[in-house]
Structure formats: C-alpha cells, structure tokens
Amino acid sequence: MPKVGVEQSLTAISEELRGMGYDVVQLKQEQDAQGCDCCVITGQDQNVMGIQNAVTQGAVINASGLTAEEVCQQVDQRLRQQ
C-alpha cells in the first residue's frame, strides 16, 4: 500500500487515510517525508519542513481549507496517476 506522510496536527486526515488502507506516517521533521508516495501538509509552514525542496518524489497536498474527505480524495487521485 502507498505510504502517505501527514503533518502531526492533521489527525482526522490520518485516521481517514488509515481507514482507506494507506500506510500513514506522521511528519515531524524533514526526514519523515523520505520514502513517502504523497505528503499532506497544513500549509501554514508550507516550506519550513523542506518538503517542497524535493525531499519526497511524491505529491505534496496542501490541506488548508479542505475537509478530511476532500484531502483523502486528492491523495487517492494523485496516487492513481503515478
């Protein structure tokens, strides 16, 4: 199953993705994003973690303003495109 990194504060999204069968990893620092097929961030510190500096080869989804369901749909779509 694809590995999805999710920022710590996005608990509802983590739980929903786990329910969909994804391997969810909590993003606490830059290295946590390595090996992830997709990362979900809050958008508050969009590049503080360095995720958009090509730490991960996967998609980066900004969860700002989206519901957990909307974010999970985006994760699903992006991972199917890869």
UniProtKB/Swiss-Prot annotation:
Family: Belongs to the UPF0180 family.
NCBIfam families assigned: PRK03094.1
Protein name: UPF0180 protein BH2667
Organism of this sequence: Halalkalibacterium halodurans (strain ATCC BAA-125 / DSM 18197 / FERM 7344 / JCM 9153 / C-125)
Organismal lineage: Bacteria, Bacillati, Bacillota, Bacilli, Bacillales
